[in-house]
């Protein structure tokens, strides 16, 4: 090749690359474009709303409808590039959605544990930090064109039924915990610390799936056809609670409606749920998006409308603003032409969408010149971020049983057998909706750091389903020659997943036989490690004498192996608490997953759901968890009488209930100061759970369905060995001490209330509150 031809070819390549980069700009309002200055939507001195309205006013109907879908086409004539709205960040930046890509520039991102495990930490500051890390990595990837700015996370559905395949994505069964997680993770993702009144967003977060969505595919009944029959009582105090907190306290910028119907109406077509509640009552400042193809689902699968145009009109009029999928893009224009929809309905939806992009800086020019513009590939998978992923896994691990053999001594283990289908897990540990992790540390790799030359490994099963017994004999032989065995069993995405609910609560296939045979062959200590999201009935294992300890490790993320090993060998003192009730198999045998009721029914024999209502005997209770230390708690100060001011003032009545709409709730707060003493020789963290037991008269006053007990506060406290720490728990009385009646109305009940401090794995203490009606809201101590 001649030098001249080489130079020409080089210039052509440079021009092509430059052209490609130009065509792939991930921002609008490029200051180098002459026309930019005349566009009102590029004028940063105007309000977001004014800029969004200006942009929408410049679009034709054909252009408008193509911006109502996740794969927005953009408006090239105005310098607005295409934008992919769908990105995921459930527990790390994920390439599950089309908005994120990994390549040689950014090969992976920090992969935290599944949400169900980080929820077990009961650590609000951890949840906030995780959100901050994820949003930093998202912004860094956006700056190099590998990620969007809108993330459809977190999942804040309550883990209603232990068989649900997507329970792993949630913070558990308790509405307060789910709400606290939602608020903190959303703030971590979205908040810009020096934003002031600008309401800028770091990235946009989305709370999903609204609402009463917690069934995917159980015995042939799928989420696309399921009609969730929910009482007003359960809707108010269980299903809606996390979403309300997410919007009102977390200030989330998006909510996603779900596939299912609620009481006969598809959630994405319900004007009461969307326009009435989210937009009207809760005052969402953001957009409402459908789960992917939800409009198509209610048209094609359940034939909810006669025509596609009717389906589109119904959704937009109900308050939907965006469609994950292409249904709105295909049929909205014709719906307007047929007068089933007004052009103003389309404009309204687009304005809500564009305001979010304005807050993200998408219309402020090159992101490299904006806040977070300095972030790049070196800010993804940083050492600090990977250390936080390890810390999150350690904080969530729950010690279920310990007969004194843990922690294992680091120097006296002569031969360690590592057994089980999840013993060498890698991808299993990062759960679903995960991206490419920075790196993996499997359980066996973590354990090898403590016993580098004395480990023997046998899987015992070909996979988690464990369909045959052929590998069990080799596992038994390995165990018989070892003095300590770590047996890692459980579930994975082939057993519990999106689109796949469990039928049973037992270990799959021959895993139970593997556990029994290993335990019977073991000379000494067996440590049983359970990797799963949903609970498993392991009652049989409690009676096997060689099983000296049991750990639940959820799906522990990229650093799971190190976390497990550090807990087993005592470099970390476990402190996690179960965020879900562990039910016996009997529950799955008797209770239909399609029954949405939370409260028990003695007539039908329905036992109720979650620790708040379940009347059966669980394998392990919500909040259960052991430590290598011994802790005690005590109340240092707390009110004993609460006077409630009502409007109008009501007469004192020892056995009455008051609608909270008549109560001056604004200043009705109480504070409890609690002390925690560590009696052990190890420093550790203690999760203090504060439960509330309503007055005995409550059932008759609110029409039944009163919780057995209810979590009203929690705090994770670090306490040095032989040291004492104190902390405060603040309660909003109207939220914490209220009950929901059968009409869905919140009531305060006067009389004697009991606070229970500690779970059933702790030494519980009690504090009594006397709630009275009065002419003022003074709290007497």
UniProtKB/Swiss-Prot annotation:
GO BP terms in the entry: xylan catabolic process
Residues annotated as the enzyme's active site: 291
GO cellular component terms attached to this protein's record: extracellular region
Transmembrane segments: none
Entry keyword Cell division: no
Signal sequence extent: 1-23
EC numbers for this chain: 3.2.1.-
Location within or outside the cell: Secreted, Extracellular space, Extracellular matrix
GO molecular function: xylan 1,4-beta-xylosidase activity
Main subcellular location: secreted
One Pfam family this sequence matches: Glyco_hydro_3_C
Alphabetical list of PANTHER family matching this protein: BETA-D-XYLOSIDASE 5-RELATED, SUGAR HYDROLASE-RELATED
Protein name: Probable beta-D-xylosidase 5
Gene designation per UniProt: BXL5
């Amino acid at each position: 090749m001649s030098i001249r031809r080489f130079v020409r070819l080089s210039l052509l390549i440079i021009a092509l690359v430059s052209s490609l980069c130009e065509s792939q700009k991930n921002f609008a309002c490029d200051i180098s474009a002459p026309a930019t200055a005349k566009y009102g939507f590029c004028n940063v001195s105007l309000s977001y709303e004014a800029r969004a309205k200006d942009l929408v006013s410049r679009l034709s109907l054909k252009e408008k409808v193509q911006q109502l879908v996740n794969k927005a086409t953009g408006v090239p004539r105005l310098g607005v590039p295409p934008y992919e709205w769908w990105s995921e960040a459930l527990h790390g930046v994920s390439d599950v959605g089309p908005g994120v890509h990994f390549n040689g520039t950014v090969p992976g991102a920090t992969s935290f544990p599944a949400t169900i495990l980080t929820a077990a930490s009961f650590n609000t500051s951890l949840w906030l930090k995780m959100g901050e890390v994820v949003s930093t990595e998202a912004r860094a990837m956006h700056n190099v064109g590998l990620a969007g700015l809108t993330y459809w996370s977190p999942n804040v559905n309550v883990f209603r039924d232990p068989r649900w395949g997507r329970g792993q994505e949630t913070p558990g069964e308790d509405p307060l915990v789910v709400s606290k997680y939602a608020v903190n993770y959303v703030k971590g993702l979205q908040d810009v610390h020096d934003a002031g009144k600008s309401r800028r967003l770091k990235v946009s977060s989305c709370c999903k799936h609204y609402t009463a969505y917690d069934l995917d595919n159980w015995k042939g009944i799928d989420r696309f056809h399921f009609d969730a029959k929910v009482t007003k009582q359960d809707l108010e105090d269980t299903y809606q609670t996390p979403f309300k907190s997410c919007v009102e306290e977390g200030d989330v910028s998006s909510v996603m409606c779900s596939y299912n119907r609620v009481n006969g109406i598809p959630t994405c077509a319900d004007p009461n749920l969307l326009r009435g509640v989210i937009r009207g009552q809760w005052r969402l400042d953001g957009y409402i998006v459908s789960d992917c193809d939800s409009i198509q689902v209610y048209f094609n699968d359940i034939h909810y409308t006669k025509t596609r145009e009717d389906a589109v009109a119904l959704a937009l009029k109900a308050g939907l603003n965006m469609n994950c999928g292409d249904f709105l893009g295909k049929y909205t224009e014709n719906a307007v032409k047929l007068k089933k929809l007004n052009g103003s309905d389309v404009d309204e939806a687009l304005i809500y969408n564009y305001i979010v992009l304005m807050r993200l800086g998408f219309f402020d020019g090159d992101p490299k010149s904006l806040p977070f513009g300095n972030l790049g590939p070196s800010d993804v998978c940083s050492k600090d971020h990977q250390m936080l992923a390890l810390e999150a896994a350690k904080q969530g691990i729950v010690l279920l049983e310990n007969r004194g053999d843990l922690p294992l001594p680091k120097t006296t283990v002569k031969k360690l057998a590592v057994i089980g289908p999840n013993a060498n897990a890698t991808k299993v540990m990062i759960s679903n909706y995960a991206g490419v992790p920075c790196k993996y540390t499997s359980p066996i790799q973590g354990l090898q750091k403590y016993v580098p030359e004395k480990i023997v490994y046998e899987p015992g099963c070909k996979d988690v389903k464990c369909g045959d017994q052929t590998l069990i004999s080799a596992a038994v032989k390995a165990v018989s020659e070892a003095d300590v065995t770590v047996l890692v069993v459980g579930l994975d995405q082939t057993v519990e997943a999106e689109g796949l609910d469990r039928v049973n609560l037992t270990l799959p296939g021959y895993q139970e036989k593997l556990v029994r045979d290993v335990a019977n062959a073991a000379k000494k200590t067996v440590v049983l490690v359970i990797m799963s999201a949903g609970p498993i009935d392991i009652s049989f294992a409690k009676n096997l004498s060689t099983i000296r300890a049991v750990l639940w490790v959820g799906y522990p993320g990229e650093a799971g192996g190190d976390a497990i090993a550090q807990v087993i060998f005592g470099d970390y003192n476990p402190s996690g608490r179960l965020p879900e009730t562990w039910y016996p198999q009997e529950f799955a045998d008797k209770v239909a997953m399609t029954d949405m009721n939370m409260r028990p029914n003695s007539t039908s024999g329905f036992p109720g759901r979650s620790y708040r209502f379940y009347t059966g005997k669980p394998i392990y209770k919500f909040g259960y968890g052991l430590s290598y230390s011994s802790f005690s708690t005590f109340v240092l100060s707390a009110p004993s009488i609460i006077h409630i001011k009502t409007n109008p003032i009501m007469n004192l009545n020892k056995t009455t209930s008051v609608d909270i709409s008549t109560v001056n709730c604004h200043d009705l707060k109480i504070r409890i100061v609690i002390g925690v003493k560590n009696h052990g020789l190890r420093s550790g963290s203690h999760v203090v759970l504060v439960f509330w037991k309503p007055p005995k008269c409550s059932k008759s006053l609110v029409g039944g369905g009163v919780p057995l007990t209810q979590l009203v506060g929690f705090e994770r406290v670090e306490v040095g060995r032989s040291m004492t720490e104190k902390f405060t728990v603040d309660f909003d009385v109207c939220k914490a001490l209220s009950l929901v009646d059968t009409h869905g109305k919140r009531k305060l009940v006067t009389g004697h209330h009991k606070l229970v401090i500690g779970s059933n794995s702790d030494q519980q203490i009690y504090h009594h509150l006397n709630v009275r009606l009065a002419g003022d809201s003074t709290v007497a101590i």
